[in-house]
Design a protein with these regions (language model features):
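SAM-dependent nucleic-acid methyltransferase catalytic core
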Residues: 1-77, 81-89, 122, 163
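Class I S-adenosyl-L-methionine
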Residues: 56, 60-75, 82-169
Length: 169
């Protein structure tokens, strides 16, 4: 419950102390801030509990977790802070520099199971993950700049249906 309350009452998406504002929308564009959502809280908590049943959550450096669970039966999905050169400014309490991204890639390349890695299109990942399957989507950042988001996979999705389960259209 505390987690859900923190999500709903958070000050924007950043966690580095930068002022981004209280969640609200006086123009009615975002139903996400409606009081009705609070009435649905018990149901949402039950849905979340069902969804994460059997999921193991670790609070350790990602590289350590990936190395510990290096097995063909373990799927790794990584959504790290995007490479600094692809975005405007620091946005996370725990940032990653290029050296950290290199270390992460080294560990992912050694992983025996399936890997999915999210990020903006960048030379570092493209160079190191040559041969991995890529799926691209074009989005616009908060500054309205065009960004290509990429999902790198160390496997080929079996078919279009499997791919749509990973990336809904």
């Amino acid at each position: 419950v505390n987690f859900y309350v923190r999500l709903q009452m958070g000050h924007g998406f950043r966690t580095n102390g930068e002022k981004v504002g209280w969640k609200n929308d006086v123009q009615g564009r975002e139903r996400a801030y409606a009081a009705k959502d609070w009435c649905e809280l018990p149901e949402k908590i039950m849905q979340a509990a069902e969804r994460i049943r059997g999921v193991q959550i670790e609070c350790r450096p990602a590289v350590d977790v990936i190395q510990r669970f290096n097995s063909p039966k373990v799927l790794i999905y990584v959504d790290p802070p995007y490479v600094l050169g692809t975005r405007h400014g620091k946005q996370y309490r725990c940032e990653m520099d290029d050296k950290d991204h290199e270390e992460l890639i080294d560990v992912l390349l050694d992983h025996k199971g399936p890997v999915l890695l999210s990020g903006y299109d960048n030379a570092l990942y493209n160079g190191r993950l040559r041969g991995w399957h890529r799926e691209e989507t074009v989005n616009y950042s908060q500054t309205a700049s065009r960004k290509t988001e990429v999902l790198w996979m160390n496997f080929e999705p079996e078919d279009e249906e499997a791919l749509n389960m990973i990336i809904p259209k």
